[in-house]
Amino acid sequence: YAFLLHDRESGQSALVDSPDAKAIRAELDQRGWGLNYILLTHHHWDHVDGVDALRQHYDAKVIGAKADAHRLPGLDRAVSDGETFDLFGAPVHVMDVSGHTLGHIAFYLPDSQAVFTADSLMALGCGRLFEGTPAQMWQSLSRLAALPADTLVYSGHEYTQSNAAFALTIEPDNAALQARVAEVNTKAKRREATVPSYLREEIETYPFLRASNPKVKA
């Protein structure tokens, strides 16, 4: 997934991750928007592949992790964990969520009650460990879980149905999980997105965020 953010007052737009320049340009053109910022979560090609092509058409500033600067295309501003920057007059908090990769960051927008997690925390899952350690991923998931429960989680991939099937093998008697799996399967049949999800849902149904529960430990 890539996500477009638009500020009606200023007319400015931002993009979180850039997998497919052609599709993103088509959406921007359809809406009559320009592109002012590109926020990158990590260096994997399916999150940065469209950056160079988009920059040929838009004067967009690229923002990404300082720790990943050597692997991010066209980086204009390098940000670090704990840093806050302004986007459309609202704060964006940078969170280190290493694990899937080293240097992976999430963007938390408290005023919008949204966090863009890409391949760290997903709907009922998390990204595979390519570079980080299990301890790093656990720390990252724990940090994200500490955000307000009504935060919307915008993750990077539509893996929810397979993640749900795995979660059921861990907690088959979790009523909240059973209900969510049914909803996910219904959406899959309709070819509807399951992203974003509420952080509350992840805490109630995702086993890795429920590791302190005796049933999950068993």
Language-model features and meaning:
Residues 139-152, 161-218:
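Accessory terminal helices/loops
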Residues 1-34, 106-118:
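Conserved beta-strand hairpin/beta-sheet module of binuclear metal-dependent hydrolase folds
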Residues 16, 62-64, 116-117, 155:
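Hydrophobic residues in well-ordered beta-strands that form the structural core
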Residues 109, 117, 149-160:
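Anionic-ligand binding patches
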